[in-house]
Design a protein with these regions (language model features):
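Conserved mid-core segment of classical short-chain dehydrogenase/reductases
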Residues: 84-99, 144
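Active-site helix of classical SDR
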Residues: 113, 148-149
Length: 250
């Protein structure tokens, strides 16, 4: 159960996957929700069952981001939006992949924080939840995506320090591989996408939502800083070894 001091929330990337699952859970808890996404098709359908606000917005449009979000006064920010473009690594990512994914995964997060957090501090109440990743905590073969999520990890840590004493909490959720549409966008090769999402039992969106709800259930004196959640069959880290096929013998 969400701490009763929180009455309203903004969820970015609410139209699918983890954001959508969390939206439904918030609505069941009677939280006033602003659901933001570029694609609002599923949100429109859900709006026939529940009362909530939809913000149709591409987070790459920074000017519109500030125009829309500066109007809001909320208690919970779930900065969940992200894309997988470029996740195949620096050797395969295009220039556009790098630019667009950096804008969405990293820059828009900072702009969203700037638009929302000062009002939380002024109101002396709030909880910021940032969507990180195991790829941001452990080196993996994903220089682009891993680097961006590594930046989110540092942003979360620094924000927590910056907001000390403000009564605004900061939590970073770091999931492992989760059954969402991530791989479809991350890999141009369908075979690679299928391989990435197979071989073990994946997390599901509801598992990540459980972690979000846990962080939001704590008393004011308790701040869950980082939640690292992986599938039971997934062990992050490790030491992969790839022998060189044509070593230089000198």
């Amino acid at each position: 159960m969400i701490n009763t001091i929180y009455k309203s929330a903004l969820i970015t990337g609410a139209g699918n996957g983890i954001g959508y699952e969390t939206l439904k859970r918030f609505l069941k808890e009677k939280i006033k929700v602003y659901a933001l996404d570029k694609n609002i098709k599923k949100l429109k359908i859900l709006q026939k069952q529940f009362k909530f606000n939809i913000i149709e917005l591409d987070l790459a449009d920074t000017n519109k981001l500030y125009r829309e979000l500066s109007k809001l006064k909320i208690d919970i920010l779930f900065a969940n939006a992200g894309i997988g473009r470029g996740a195949e690594g620096i050797l395969y990512a295009s220039r556009d992949d790098i630019e667009i994914s950096t804008k969405i995964n990293m820059e828009s997060c900072l702009h969203t924080l700037k638009a929302i957090v000062p009002k939380m501090v002024k109101n002396r109440k709030g909880h910021v939840i940032l969507m990180g990743s195991l790829a941001g905590l452990y080196p993996q073969i994903s220089t682009v995506y891993g680097g961006q999520k590594g930046a989110i990890h540092r942003i979360a840590q620094s924000l927590r320090l910056e907001l000390s004493g403000s009564r605004v909490k900061v939590t970073e959720i770091c999931p492992g591989r989760t059954k969402t549409n991530f791989a479809k966008a991350a890999f141009t090769d369908k075979t690679k996408a299928k391989k990435f999402m197979s071989g073990f039992t994946l997390l599901e969106a509801k598992d990540i939502t459980d972690a979000v709800m846990f962080a939001l259930s704590t008393r004011w004196r308790s701040n869950i800083s980082t939640i690292e959640i992986s599938g039971t069959e997934q062990s992050p880290g490790g030491v992969p070894i790839y022998p060189v096929k044509d070593p230089i013998l000198s």
